[in-house]
Amino acid sequence: VTYPSYDNNELVNTFNNAYYNDLLQDGNTPLVNRPLKQKKASGSTFKMITALAGLETGTITPSTTIVDKGLFKDAGVPYARCWIYSNTGGTHGPVNVSHALEVSCNYFFYELGYRLGSTANGSDSNKAITTLNEYMAAFGLNDYTGVELDEYGPTMASPANKEKAVKTFNPDATTSQTRWTDGDTIRTAIGQSINSYTPAQITKYVS
């Protein structure tokens, strides 16, 4: 099932060329197979991966509490915002991982993504994204779904894919523009950054 819909009866038996041409010109692209050929950021569905990475690496425990301060400043400017701060100016206050998933607290997962890069000398954004990439791959977010239909492949947030994306728009981009940053990591941790998947890929991940 895909949306917007169209009348299949016009495209069988006596094929309606005029109707088909109208569909091709329709700005809503009704002929696009959206489950397999429309990619979007995974958004908050991704937070379960960040949670699992944090728990299995010992970065947090089920009882670890993080205080939502609204603006996450440790990754530099522009400061990342929790959705509730953007909408109301408020915060979720102290939350553990289960509560953070329940209320979809962005701040908790910014902090957790940042902590995944913790080292004796501070935060290492490459360490953090390497860990997240391992868990993304474990859930199949680095590969096609395997359905026997033509589909778009995933775009997994990673240093290599960031560099590729930046240079697509700016072939002369400098190293400072293409390098992976803490800001990229924390946005990846909530399913943003350059994460891009079809509905079918997200369905496979959560199934």
Question: Model-derived features: where do they sit?
Answer:
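Beta-lactam-recognizing serine transpeptidase/beta-lactamase-like catalytic domain environment
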Residues: 1-44, 49-207
